[in-house]
A protein has these predicted regions:
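Short, surface-exposed acidic-centric catalytic microdomains
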Residues: 32-74
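Residue-level detector of anion-binding/catalytic polar loops
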Residues: 56, 85, 134
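N-terminal Rossmann-like dinucleotide-binding module
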Residues: 2-45
Length: 215
């Protein structure tokens, strides 16, 4: 497909969501191509996944930077060099600075392992189990300066079972992440091909209206 949106993917670890996007992007009809994969972790297995797919990679070790803003500037520079139009966070374990987010307005998407706006931050599977909810899931959303609060793109739900541990629930949610992230990327890539995207902070009604159950 011509005129594909160029996407930069930021990772820190295994890269299962990266692999899902790689697989989807190999289809001719997919509206996005991965221009570069950047990791702050030199040992991230996701780098091998990208290399195996002939995708350019770059390691930018955050430990080499005294200031978070300097690290973010280095990442942004590589994304600009690769002509990226959209950024996907796929297991990227760094909080981006407000300056970085503002430099890429409505051009950064993330996947979070809960049904936002519920259970923000870390250890969300434990939060869900402790709250005794019956449904958990994952959310693809735009990144804004406020953590886990950007406009929702899509969600997938899974049941929380009585015998669930944080690990078992996390594994089941991850399967849905692998399904929903490429779908959300496809949607956004099509939308930004000459069409503006309006920012809007999430609320409960947004989450309910855009719930996609893939379980």
């Amino acid at each position: 497909m011509s005129n594909r949106i160029k996407v930069g993917i930021l990772i820190s670890g295994n890269g299962t969501n990266l692999q899902a996007i790689i697989d989807a992007s190999q289809k001719d009809s997919f509206p996005a191509e991965i221009a570069i994969v950047i990791s702050n972790n030199p040992s991230a297995y996701g780098l091998k996944r990208a290399t195996s797919a002939d995708i350019p990679t770059k390691v930018i070790d955050h430990k080499l930077f005294d200031q978070r803003e300097d690290f973010d500037t280095a990442v942004s520079l590589e994304l600009r060099k690769a002509d990226c139009e959209l950024i996907c966070l796929a297991g990227f374990m760094r909080i981006l600075s407000e300056q970085f987010v503002n430099n890429w307005p409505m051009r950064i998407i993330n996947i979070h392992p809960s049904l936002l706006p519920s259970f923000k931050g870390r250890n969300v599977q434990k939060q869900a189990i402790d709250a005794e909810v019956r449904i958990a899931g994952c959310t693809v959303h735009f990144v804004i300066s406020e953590l886990d609060a950007g406009p929702i793109i899509a969600q997938a739900a899974v049941p929380v079972l009585k015998q669930d541990t944080p690990a078992s629930l996390s594994a089941r949610i991850l399967q849905q992440e692998n399904h929903i992230y490429p779908l959300a990327l496809e949607l956004i890539a099509k939308k930004i091909q000459g069409k503006p995207i309006n920012a809007r902070k999430t609320n409960t009604s947004d989450a309910e209206e855009k719930l996609i159950s893939l379980y």
